């Protein structure tokens, strides 16, 4: 039988192991380790670690989830979950149930714009892909999340023959030999550095870009008592830029300007995006980009000059293999890390686009039109097709033909004509405004007679008549011109 000190040691280690495993977003207690569980995650520290954002306090109340914007995002399927699950902090920390179909499309569009801006139109940036987990032994100070077999852990804990020292040794060995969930994308880029260095014939500068899910510990004493941490998840867009130390400061300034202008490009109120200096515990300097939410500024992207420390740590013993060419000189490059949180960025654009305007559909002055005026490039759905008065079968056939034509040309469409519940045009327009749909195309009996449709704009609420054959070209040019602004 184990001694009391051994039991207390087990409890401390298990509390550490269970961090991130059982924190439920709906406020339930952490789940117990059951026989049906295959693996779970415990915290350790990542080797290639970026300076962290400032820790956040848990929300004082859950009232933030009932605000008008979050309610619209739930109603129109940008976000999934209940009001209680969609508190301010759960959205910022990535501890909510997830995105709805429109939220998925919005984040996909945001990621596509980032990729085009950073990778596609730049000759010195290359895509890279890395595992969600980082293999290999961990360092003693490592406190990132570990992937541990629940069955293996159960066998160790249930072995009553083990002494305190043996139990601790087994558990530490289990942690040290298990893979860890990545907290950022830096480690993967550094792993691929040498192979890409050969690709560019060792010429500096160049960059490696990746978009992927990352995981981080979140403290919330209300949800998870006894110090057990929950797992927060975010979609990170990362550019790791390798340059000589001589030009590192200039490149950091360049990317700071580039990234700030990029965020502002898609905003209704560009001034809500700003930048500021920051510094980590080691004295390394960097910059943060912020969005000014109604409650205050929150970071959405960070830029760091990490020097050569991480690169030399990744490739110990052979400095020559990491040398790049700066003109005629062989140098160990400085590493610039530019990593943006696309989930926070998406939340920023939802707040930026949300407007309450006077409702022209009603004479009641206390009612307002709620509209999400997302940038045309980011809007999840560009057009909605609906039917007015006339023979239903024939009108739906026309809608189906136009639907297929628009999809074939890369224009996302909402098939409102398939709806079986009757709604007034005013109700349809309100619904589509809240879904941030740019244009509503109304197919009526007149379309069957002369080919004319009614086109209604989300931003102006103006309606105009247009021949159905011109709709595709009009939408294509509208979206294309918005990209170039």
Swiss-Prot record:
Region (Disordered) residue spans: 28-67
Keywords: DNA replication, DNA-binding, Mitochondrion, Mitochondrion nucleoid, Transit peptide
Chain's role: Accessory subunit of DNA polymerase gamma solely responsible for replication of mitochondrial DNA (mtDNA). Acts as an allosteric regulator of the holoenzyme activities. Enhances the polymerase activity and the processivity of POLG by increasing its interactions with the DNA template. Suppresses POLG exonucleolytic proofreading especially toward homopolymeric templates bearing mismatched termini. Binds to single-stranded DNA.
Gene source species: Bos taurus (Bovine)
One GO cellular component, as annotated: cytoplasm
Keyword DNA-binding part of the UniProt annotation: yes
Pfam families per record: HGTP_anticodon (PF03129)
Main location: mitochondrion
GO molecular function ontology, one term from the record: DNA binding
Subunit record text: Heterotrimer composed of a catalytic subunit and a homodimer of accessory subunits (POLG:POLG2).
Family matches, as InterPro entries: aa-tRNA-synth_II/BPL/LPL, Anticodon-bd, Anticodon-bd_dom_sf, Gly-tRNA_synthase/POLG2, POLG2_C
Name of protein: DNA polymerase subunit gamma-2
Domain of life: Eukaryota
BP term (GO), one: mitochondrial DNA replication
């Amino acid at each position: 039988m184990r001694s009391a000190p051994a039991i207390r040691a087990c409890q401390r280690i298990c509390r550490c192991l269970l961090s991130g495993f059982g924190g439920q977003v709906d406020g339930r207690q952490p789940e117990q380790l059951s026989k049906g569980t295959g693996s779970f995650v415990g915290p350790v520290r990542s080797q290639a670690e970026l300076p962290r954002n400032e820790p956040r306090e848990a929300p004082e109340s859950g009232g933030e989830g009932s605000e008008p914007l979050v309610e619209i995002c739930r109603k129109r399927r940008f976000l999934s979950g209940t009001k209680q699950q969609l508190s301010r902090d759960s959205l910022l920390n990535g501890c909510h149930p997830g995105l709805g179909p429109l939220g998925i499309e919005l984040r996909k569009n945001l990621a596509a714009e980032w990729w085009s801006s950073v990778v596609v139109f730049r000759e010195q940036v290359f895509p890279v892909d890395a595992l969600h987990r980082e293999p290999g032994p961990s360092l003693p100070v490592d406190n990132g999340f570990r992937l541990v077999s629940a069955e293996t852990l159960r066998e160790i804990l249930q072995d009553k023959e083990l002494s305190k020292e043996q139990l601790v040794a087994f558990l530490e060995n289990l942690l040290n030999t298990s893979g860890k969930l990545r907290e950022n994308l830096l480690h993967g880029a550094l792993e691929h550095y040498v192979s890409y260095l050969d690709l560019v014939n060792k010429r500096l500068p160049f960059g490696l870009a990746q978009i992927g899910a990352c995981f981080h510990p979140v403290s919330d004493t209300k949800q998870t008592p006894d110090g057990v941490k929950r797992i927060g998840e975010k979609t990170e867009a990362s550019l790791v830029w390798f340059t000589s130390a001589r030009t590192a400061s200039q490149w950091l300034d360049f990317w700071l300007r580039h990234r700030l202008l990029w965020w502002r490009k898609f905003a209704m109120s560009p001034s809500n995006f700003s930048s500021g200096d920051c510094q980590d515990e080691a004295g390394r300097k960097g910059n943060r980009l912020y969005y000014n939410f109604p409650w205050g500024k929150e970071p959405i992207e960070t830029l760091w000059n990490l020097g050569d420390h991480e690169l030399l740590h990744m490739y110990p013993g052979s400095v020559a293999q990491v040398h790049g060419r700066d003109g005629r000189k062989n140098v160990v490059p400085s590493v610039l890390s530019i990593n943006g949180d696309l989930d926070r960025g998406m939340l920023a654009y939802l707040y930026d686009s949300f407007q309450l305007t006077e409702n022209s559909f009603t004479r009641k002055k206390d009612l307002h039109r709620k509209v999400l005026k997302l940038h045309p490039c980011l809007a999840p759905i560009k057009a909605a097709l609906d039917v007015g008065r006339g023979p239903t079968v024939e009108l739906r056939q026309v809608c189906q033909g136009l639907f297929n034509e628009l999809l074939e040309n890369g224009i996302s469409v909402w098939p409102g004509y398939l709806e079986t519940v009757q709604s007034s045009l005013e109700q349809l327009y309100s619904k589509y405004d809240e879904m941030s749909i740019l244009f509503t195309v109304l197919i009526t009996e007149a379309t069957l007679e002369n080919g004319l449709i009614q086109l209604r704009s989300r931003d102006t609420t103006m309606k105009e008549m247009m021949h159905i054959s011109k709709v595709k070209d009009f939408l294509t040019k509208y979206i294309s011109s918005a990209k170039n602004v």
